[in-house]
């Protein structure tokens, strides 16, 4: 019984640690790739683009990956996009050459924002 509880405690701690590292990695990429210059998360960042604080409750992982690498696939460049009642110009640069590992981490981080 004690071994089971210890194993459960260790597994929970590892999951919590991995989640914390994952969130920190995604947040770091969000900053280093310049996303924060235009987008807000929890009150921090720019206001040129939509607030992404809860983007994970609205968009799928696949949609987010497409939006990051090829924003014109979802919104025509130069068009006006209305999200949550606020209008934005579709001017986001694509990150077609972002390494797959970075893209996956960033998109998963954004999807986790619920």
Residue ranges with predicted function:
Residues 38-45, 57, 69:
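Detector for the c-type heme attachment site
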Residues 30-33, 87:
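Disulfide-bonded cysteine motifs in exported proteins
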Residues 33-41, 64, 106, 110:
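The canonical Cys-X-X-Cys-His
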Residues 13-31, 50, 60-63:
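Electrostatic cytochrome c docking/interface patches
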Residues 46-55, 71-105, 113:
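Axial heme c-ligation environment in periplasmic c-type cytochrome domains
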Residues 1-24, 67, 74, 98, ...:
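Post-cleavage N-terminal segment of exported redox proteins
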């Amino acid at each position: 019984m004690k071994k089971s509880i210890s194993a459960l405690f260790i597994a929970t701690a590892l999951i919590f640690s991995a989640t914390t590292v994952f969130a920190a990695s995604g947040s770091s990429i969000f900053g280093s790739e310049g996303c924060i210059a235009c987008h807000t998360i929890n009150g921090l960042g720019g206001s040129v683009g939509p607030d992404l604080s809860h983007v994970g409750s609205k968009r799928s992982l696949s949609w987010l990956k497409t939006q990051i690498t090829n924003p014109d696939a979802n919104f025509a460049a130069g068009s006006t996009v209305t999200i949550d009642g606020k209008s934005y110009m579709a001017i986001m640069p694509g990150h077609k050459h972002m390494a797959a590992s970075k893209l996956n981490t960033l998109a998963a981080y954004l999807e986790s924002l619920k």
